[in-house]
Amino acid sequence: MSFPKVSKDNKGKKDAVKVQFLADSLEIVLDKEKCTGCCACVRACPKEAFSRYQPEGPKELFGKQIIYKKKKYQVPFIYDPLDCSYCGLCTFICPFDALRLKVNGEEVPPEKLKLVQEKAVPQLDYKNVKLEDGREVKVYTKGSLTIDVNMCNTGCYNCAEICPSGAISMKPDIVTKKRGEYEQELEIEIEESKCLYCGACHEACPTGALKLTIDEVCYSGEYNSPFWDEAIERLKISPDDTSA
């Protein structure tokens, strides 16, 4: 029998990847019901082990740009268990507490990670925000959110539907007459005081109309460079970021 042995489980409400050595096992588990698809894990991962869902862009039908709705948003996850280093950074930075590292079958809380104990990462300065559905979110990033209405011409509603805090709303009730035809226009509202700057809307937008900026990661305490410094740069998002 050869080691390490790898396995994947993507059935049910959780996804898991596992690597089994002769004496020890390491596992990353994703709770799909908690995950919003914000892709903080994708950006932060030092091994680029996570794969993200790519929203399908608009298509032209009878001269109009439309988006075919998907019934379910896809969540990011690790497709090759050997790509992951099982360091646990993804569990440390996940705003929605959707990821867990298991060592020999036992869950390791983020504050007990070896990364924390060895001071490879500092302490996150976050505030707990309780959502209407009862979930709590760790908000430790700051930035801004705007929308380019000229690029948002499809009415897909992805951003409003995926936003966990209700910061984005759309009102498709404005009807105007153009070129002799009546057309429905979207009125988009962003209540930035509700924004968690998690990145879910940024990831779900198929046209790049949403311009999310994450320019500050809040933390304090000692840490060892360069691991955390590089993670911070990966966590940030600029309006021109086309990697999503």
What is the predicted role of each segment?
Residues K14-E27, E33-K59:
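The feature marks the first
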Residues M1-A23, G57-A244:
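Flanking helices and flexible, charged tails adjoining ferredoxin-like Fe-S electron-transfer domains
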Residues D31-K32, V149:
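Local sequence-structure signature of Cys/Sec-based thiol-disulfide redox active-site neighborhoods
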